[in-house]
Amino acid sequence: MQKYQIPYNYVIQKMLKNRIKGHDGEKYPVWAWAKCGNSICPKKRKNLNHKQQNKVKITFIKPDNEVLLSDYMAYSCILSGHIVPRTKQEYENFLKSLKSKNIVLDDLKAFVRSQKTNPQTEKEMIKVQKTWHRIFDLKSNVHQACVWHIKADEIQKIEILNDSNYLYGTMNPLRANGTRPDWKKRYLKFLP
């Protein structure tokens, strides 16, 4: 969690500001899938490294006022320290602006991960963070939910997912070529 403390804190503050019900002093929310295409969570995928531990899938129902929904693909933008653009052109302008200031995308990513800072990057991050509220616009077909806790009476089903030949619940599987999906690029496809 420390690697992405700035984006996580942003979501936590949004939950508190929006008065998402159920907060009893929990430090971190529970992250869950809310929509993945025509399903609730990602389909199982072939596991290429076979290093998965057993997983548990908990299906639960919460009242709307206890859930903060965000766009998974847009959230990937803030994990990388990027803007959450409204249009492809806005994103292109963002990249041009960074280039003119000799800031590379990895500088923003390092800032978000609290690995390094400098005054120029910090100034740019203030502008970047002003776009982060757009993760709640739900533009793509993959949504995640944050809740403060799950009560026993909200649970509908518990499944043990222990087949190491498959990955469950991930949108970032390691591909045969050693890469992972680029969610920022996929998010841009949903924009005008």
Language-model features: locations:
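Active-site and NAD+-binding cores of ADP-ribose-processing enzymes
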Residues: 60-192
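N-terminal ordered "arm"
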Residues: 1-2
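ADP-ribosyltransferase catalytic core
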Residues: 5-100
